[in-house]
Amino acid sequence: MQCIETNNLQQLLEQVKPYTKKGKLATYIPELGNANPDDLGIAIFHKETEYIHAGNSQTLFTLQSISKVITLALALLDRGEEYVFSKVGMEPTGDPFNSIIKLETTSPSKPLNPMINAGALAITSMLEGKDNEEKMERILHFVREITDNPTINYSSKVADSELETAYLNRSLCYYMKQNGIIDCDIEELMDLYTRQCAVEVNCIDLARIGLIFAMDGYDPYKKKQIIPKHITKICKTFMVTCGMYNESGEFAIRVGIPAKSGVAGGIFGCVKGDMGIGIFGPALDANGNSIAGFKILELLSAQEGWSIF
């Protein structure tokens, strides 16, 4: 890490910038279609020397599927492993993240993992709280603590945009309710889920989340354990096997670190015991990952020897 400098990051951004022209915005969520496809930013948060950043690293964007890691950690804290994995599986899937196929063809009929939409919805339904306001406040408090940013909130504009068009997610919920995976009110769950996905961060926030997971839940700046080590281990394992949608296998080969992406263009990754990386690039490849973000992580991993394999 010590050899990575801001100038080096800037050069890498310029090197991969042309890839943004090959990607597309996630226009199926109307608000995400308003992003600038040329935006590209990165931050790296180290355990000792704080962070370096380059490009559009302070532009706000929504977590989207990155929030699945946050809520998984919270659900495991609330309910424990036995309950969580009685409702959601641990296996990767070759299907799209919003597919219903495996719910229909797998026995018992439960989502294969917490990183696909069906699994993430089931996880969100497990969060403790008397109502959605309390549950959302717990999610925000958790994100604020691991980012050390008390100003973090969610975009009601993005949440409303998602809620209006989330027909497929609703169908996943109704199917799971029919099969006893969830038992809550569907519209209440959809409201909470779209809000969790609409939590706004920048690359620096995302890199700090990556650092906490890289340090097995320990915050080296606050000098305290924020997330139990065994929970971060579970989360990082899912990040390796399922974190990059249907490119998780290729990402493991080309980059080789635990990472999670979201369709707003964010990616966060962690290098064990050392650093967290946060990237923003809203131009996506065919699998829903930041096309330039993937490339810059590939180059950095090759340069720095990050791969865990």
Curated annotation (Swiss-Prot):
The keyword Hydrolase applies. The keyword Metal-binding does not apply. Pfam families: Glutaminase. It is an enzyme of class 3 (hydrolase). It catalyses: L-glutamine + H2O = L-glutamate + NH4(+). It comes from the Bacteria. Its EC number is 3.5.1.2. Keywords: Hydrolase. GO terms for molecular function: glutaminase activity. InterPro entries: Beta-lactam/transpept-like, Glutaminase. Homotetramer. Belongs to the glutaminase family. This is Glutaminase 1.
